Swiss-Prot record:
InterPro entries: 2-HAD, HAD-like_sf, HAD-SF_hydro_IA, HAD_sf, PGP-like_dom2, S-2-haloacid_dehalogenase. Catalyzes the hydrolytic dehalogenation of small (S)-2-haloalkanoic acids to yield the corresponding (R)-2-hydroxyalkanoic acids. Active with 2-halogenated carboxylic acids and converts only the S-isomer (or L-isomer) of 2-chloropropionic acid with inversion of configuration to produce R-lactate (or D-isomer). Keywords: Hydrolase. The keyword Transferase does not apply. It is an enzyme of class 3 (hydrolase). This is (S)-2-haloacid dehalogenase 1. The active site is at 10 (nucleophile).
Length: 227
């Protein structure tokens, strides 16, 4: 096994809590807030996959907006333009998970290159990383917008290798999303799934190498693997 040189993270759902945009305005949304947040996320991801399959790329902000429109209409809230605008503003400033900053800092201190590989475009990522105080803890922020293909297409993971000048076997890829872990594992990355709520394992043809319940466990795992 090659030594791990780079720790590459998914952003949305892994370092950044995608539910905080809706939860920030839950009192205005009412009892459907959790369902709306879940549907928004589901459609956002679905649109990224279908557009990649169709060869009809649009940036992640457009997909995020279109997915929110669908979710709001599904709950009879599409006419609430003020609510839509506030939710989109909140998505630009998603909260980071509490252990994200400390984990990234510990990895950098241990000598690992830290990077994000995200479907988000650069403008989205800059705002969210700044709001979450993550900018200084990352060596690189890699957006699929540069190649206009979404994860989990293998070309995206190769793009990260090219940007970081590493082989797949030298990458530890970290994500909370099973589909992303499956794609990264099939490509050849060493994968770690952050499974905060103990969801069942998926994509058995490319299972995660390791599973953790929090980001804070990651530095110790990597130090153990590199000894």
């Amino acid at each position: 096994m090659d030594p791990i040189r780079a720790c590459v993270f998914d952003a949305y759902g892994t370092l950044l809590d995608v539910n905080t945009a809706v939860m920030k305005h839950a009192h205005d949304i009412g009892g459907c807030a959790e369902e709306l947040s879940s549907l928004w996320r589901q459609r956002q991801l679905e649109y990224s996959w279908t557009r990649t399959l169709m060869g009809r790329y649009a940036d992640f902000w457009q997909l995020t907006t279109e997915a929110l429109d669908f979710a709001l209409e599904s709950f009879g809230l599409l006419e609430r333009t003020d609510l839509k605008n506030r939710l989109l503003d909140a998505y630009h400033e998603l909260s980071a998970y509490p252990d994200a900053v400390g984990t990234l800092g510990a990895l950098k201190a241990a000598g690992f290159t830290t990077a994000i590989l995200s479907n988000g475009n650069n403008e989205m990522l800059r705002g969210a990383l700044r709001a979450g105080n993550l900018t200084e803890a990352l060596d690189q922020c890699i957006s699929v917008d540069e190649i206009k293909i979404y994860k989990p297409d293998p070309r995206v993971y190769q793009f990260a290798c090219d940007r970081l000048d590493v082989r797949p076997s030298e990458v530890c890829f970290v994500s909370s999303n099973a589909w992303d872990i499956g794609g990264a594992g099939a490509f050849g990355f060493n994968t770690v799934r952050i499974n905060r709520i103990n969801k069942p394992q998926e994509y058995s043809f490319a299972p995660q190498r390791h599973q953790l319940s929090s980001l804070s466990e990651l530095p110790q795992l990597l130090l153990r693997l590199t000894q």
